[in-house]
Amino acid sequence: MEQQQQKSAVHVSKLFVCTAVDCKDEIEEKFERSYASLQQQIAGLSDKEMHDMLTQFVCKEKQHEEISIGFLYIILTDPAMAPKTYRDITLVSRDGMNVIVANLTLLVAEKYTKLTETARRQLIWVLREFVKHQVLSVENVIWNCLRQAGGGDVSHKNLFLVESLLDIFIEYRAWLETNPFLVQSSVYSFVRLIEDHANPALISLRQKEVKFTISLIRDRFHDIIPLGRDFVRLLQNVARIPEFEQLWRDILYNPKSLHPTFNGIWHLLQIRTSRRFLQCRLLPEMERKLHFLASSVKFGNQKRYQDWFQDKYFATPESHSLRSDLIRFIINVIHPTNDMLCSDIIPRWAIIGWLISSCTNPIASANAKLSLFYDWLFFDPAKDNIMNIEPGILVMYHSIRNHPFVSSTLLDFLCRITKNFYIKNEDKIRLGVYNSLKLILDKQVIPNLHPLFESPKLDRELRNLIRENFREFVSPVSNMPQTMYPATHSIQAPIFKKEADQRITQIENIDVGAGVLAANSSTISLVDDDSKVATIPTESLERETEAVFSDEDGENLGRCTKNEENTDDDDDLPLSKVRLKEKPVPEKVELPEAIAESFEIFVTKRNSFTWEAFLKDFRTLPASTLDETQLNYVISNTVLILRETLPQQNVFSESKTEEKCLAKSISYPLYGLFRFLYENEDKSKKPFQSLLSEICERLSETGYLLLYFMKIHCKLQTRKNAQQSYQFKTTVYRQICEATDGKIASCLVRDLDLLEKENTTIYLWLLPDIYREFKTIAINNTDLLRITLRCVDAKNVRDIMYSIAQGKMTIFKQDGLIECIRESLEYETYEQFCLWQLIQAHDVPLKCIQDILPELEAANHPEALSHLLLLLKNEEPTNEIIRLLLSREAKSRGDPFVTSALRFWCQRCEEKLSEIIASLLTSKYPSSSPNKRKRPSKGSSAASSTPSADHVLNHLEHYRRSCRHGTGTGLYVHDMMQRALQSAYTHSNESTKKQFSDLFALAAEDETTAVGRRGGSGRGRKQPAGKKDSNNHSAGSKKNSDVVKAIYSSDESSSEEDWSKHKITQAAKKRKKAINDSD
């Protein structure tokens, strides 16, 4: 019994807080063991004796790591000994403290919550020392410390960490600014933390945070821009603070003052925030629990886990703000596999539904809903992931039966936020929501929207609000079956401020200058043109009860009372009549005589002929003739008629050859405008320009319908007059772009994007004409290329390749193609395979794209590497290609891409390949003759990607290992390669000799190089011991960096086995003997 007590007393840790039931894990045991070992070795020694002894010990990798961790343990547990220990560590460390930084990173990421108070204070002390002396990779430790500074936590322990990190950043600001990623992470974190520090007791800390953050944002705004839309979401919550209010003014009204390339708030909102920044706002422990909940807990068994999570992380009033961080993380980071989606694991929407429905704070609840729908507001199918919008629709769809209050509240919020989030760009917000819903239906995330949008459990007011906001997705109840899937969708008719129905109750306008409202104002919105904020009262948002998602059935929750039928209900009206009923009818205005008659006829007859007659009168009308009221009257009626006369379905011709169908498809009044512009290209008066501008702004389909019109018009005119060839008049399209103050390149991409979403067949039909008529814009245009690749199938790719082969279409030119390939590395696998098919169809020579070889990674870019390998097989090895290949980073297990290329070249031209590599290796050493060095040509990129000697040796070593049973070993036995290896051995340090001892052993003994090894035995005799040391060294070097890589990066992996060197050594000796005999 006494022995057990003594044993337990011995194991009391000074570094970790442990309870009686805690078991030590590998990390804790490692630190304790290293400390005990160090104490045994240095006990009773003087400083000099300790340094001498430790200097001998650290030569071996294992002892070096053990001693380093032991010293780190002393620093963290003994404040009095910390300065002396830090000095000792700098004397004995032989890797720039890499081992210490790697283990400290692991300690902070995995065990920070278990550190004693002394250890946490000493952690800050050692971090300050590391930053002061600019120790490499210390930013990894600081980033993990930032993660431990949790949101929604105002405990003394958390505030100490926050303030300590802030002091380090302020004191060493110059060092901080050298690391853009750390600048971004610190700004994102502190803007989030400032929100939690509103308590008057924390005013001094909050003021210090505000001053530092604002200063860093303004000084380093070019680094802040990539933070994207979630950074704007965080800025909204602190917008009432005077310094942030001024920042908002500059963002909204004077963006160029922040950075010359910054174009305003919409610039930020279009950028998706990186997962790393969303991740940094969750504690590592919390992240692990969340991953467990979303990947291991079965649906129906989650209640006890949710209760535990609630008690652990949502116990204080301040912790409610954490829900938004969790929802953003779940939506953007946790993307389950198909197998998980088909399993009985709890889905993401259920976790999010629980987080929202269990929130009792109205401000936090509104912010949580915004987090759920935030990606909807800016959704672009070309760039954004459907997984980011899927939870929003599913939580509403699956809650409507058992939790109708959750669904109704979320639908109400979505309707109101669409209109009021950013009034100035309401049209773009609506387009984002429209794109989201359309893609949800196209991908059949849910069968259709009818059970949700027209559920009898929704109250009448909400159903009207849904119909008003999502009229494109609402159909007459009487004509729609219960589970009908919407087969077609009409072109979106954007809603504009002038036409918007102001039915939102209790809307108030608060003058806050430029200040976007803060979260504590109980509203969510962005500022409009008049510095007013249209606000949504949270009272109208908070209509749900506490409907907790659990394994219990929610049938007993409150139900919506059944609405009584009203004779005024327009549910039974056709949708077209509902739209007419809702549209405001402009009051009639007297117009000038020059246009009054023709305009009246056009309004009455609504056809292309009367429309073109009116345009002829209106085009020459001077600005002085019309006042603003008259002009608005003309514009409103015109846009209304043009929109209503366009067919809701089948806007394009069903046949591409039949003249009757083609002519009918461009017979509507909007095409009359295009025909008029086609025939009248000279400059028009200001009223006509205003009319044209408004039509383009309000009818988003104008641009692509004009492209369609030009294709049909030219086709029909050419058939009428076969002797004359009619071409696109790009000047007409340019006129449309100028009317909207847009650049033709961006307008073209936008219009083609909309066209592809509306009708892929017509888009592909127009594509050759686009590349021919807009070739300066279209060729090598990555945006247009991405639109094409996302919609093509195998037959479409075949047809495009036919057009390229026949010379009818050119997608790429050699100059700039490499930039297209670089950007395509982020595309989906199928899209990249299609891209390489198109590149091959252009017969692009390898030399135009070979510079990208060093940039490609085996783990991340398999598509590009696969196709480049096939291209390399058709090439002969050259100095330039080999230089680029050997510039590639050689991972711990080699580069299979380089090995494969060398292997198939060895089969065809082994001697030439050996000479090129030998020449490149020889040129890396000072004793080599300058005349023998292969100098790059003027057009090459030698300066940027020249391999070092270690790079070349690494690739040769991994190639050696791949040559099992001696196959392919002839590369090493040629004269130049033998001399190159001997020269490399002569000029290498001991570490390199040990690392590549097996490779150097392939160079046969040469008496002429014996001077390079004076006094030493031959390499063949030294090899066995050297091989063992080399393996130990390589393993130790890899271990030092594996800890940080596991947290901060991901490594590539490939499988290449080592091989027996016996046969290759024999081959080398035979080759050398033959040379000597011939001499």
From Swiss-Prot:
The keyword ATP-binding does not apply. It holds the Pfam family Ints3_N. InterPro entries: HEAT_Ints3_C, INTS3, INTS3_N. GO terms for cellular component: cytoplasm; nucleus. The modification Phosphoserine is found at residues 1049-1050, 1054-1055. It is found in: Nucleus; Cytoplasm. Residues 544-574, 925-949, 1010-1079 are annotated as: Disordered. Component of the integrator complex, a multiprotein complex that terminates RNA polymerase II (Pol II) transcription in the promoter-proximal region of genes. The integrator complex provides a quality checkpoint during transcription elongation by driving premature transcription termination of transcripts that are unfavorably configured for transcriptional elongation: the complex terminates transcription by (1) catalyzing dephosphorylation of the C-terminal domain (CTD) of Pol II subunit Polr2A/Rbp1 and Spt5, and (2) degrading the exiting nascent RNA transcript via endonuclease activity. This is Integrator complex subunit 3 homolog. It comes from Drosophila mojavensis (Fruit fly).
